[in-house]
């Protein structure tokens, strides 16, 4: 993992994807596409084959970052009633489609429901940074597991016009 100021989410997602990909390769299994999709979810600049096919030259068409998902909450633990205790990182609401990201399995998609504050009062949304709350998760999650939301896909059109690379975003 290279670069500066990589978040815990970035390091965890990349390490998890690489670990599973390496385990598959060593076992002689084909690469599960879920792990390639996983590294596309984190904030990143465009990927390349590097020097795999020889000297690549410089890629200067785009230095913008892309992200396929944002972290909404971090799992702190499990309450006595079995609900997950979480800390908010980005606002989300009941009914939002989320993913539980652990280090042991591919992400699990679920719908946010039954959010509760520290007093057990029902919440429709968790709008405050670092707000502690509880909610049921689709499976057991260890502390520091993440809950994330997929972001709308951005379309990037890169083409050659008059000998120069042109890029447009929608």
Where are these regions (language model features)?
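Extended, alpha-helix-rich binding/interface surfaces that flank or overlap catalytic cores
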Residues: 1
């Amino acid at each position: 993992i290279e670069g500066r100021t990589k978040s815990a989410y970035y390091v965890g997602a990349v390490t998890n994807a690489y670990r599973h990909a390496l385990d598959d390769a060593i076992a002689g299994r084909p690469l599960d596409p879920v792990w390639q999709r996983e590294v596309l979810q984190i904030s990143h600049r465009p990927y390349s084959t590097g020097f795999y096919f020889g000297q690549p030259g410089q890629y200067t068409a785009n230095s913008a970052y892309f992200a396929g998902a944002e972290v909404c909450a971090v799992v702190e633990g499990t309450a006595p009633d079995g609900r997950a205790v979480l800390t908010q990182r980005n606002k989300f609401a009941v009914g939002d489609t989320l993913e539980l990201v652990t280090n042991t399995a591919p992400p699990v998609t679920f719908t946010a429901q039954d959010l509760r504050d520290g007093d057990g009062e029902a919440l429709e949304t968790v709008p405050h940074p670092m707000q502690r709350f509880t909610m049921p998760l689709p499976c057991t999650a260890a502390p520091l597991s993440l809950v994330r939301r997929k972001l709308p896909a951005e379309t990037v059109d890169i083409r050659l016009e008059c000998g120069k690379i042109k890029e447009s975003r929608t």
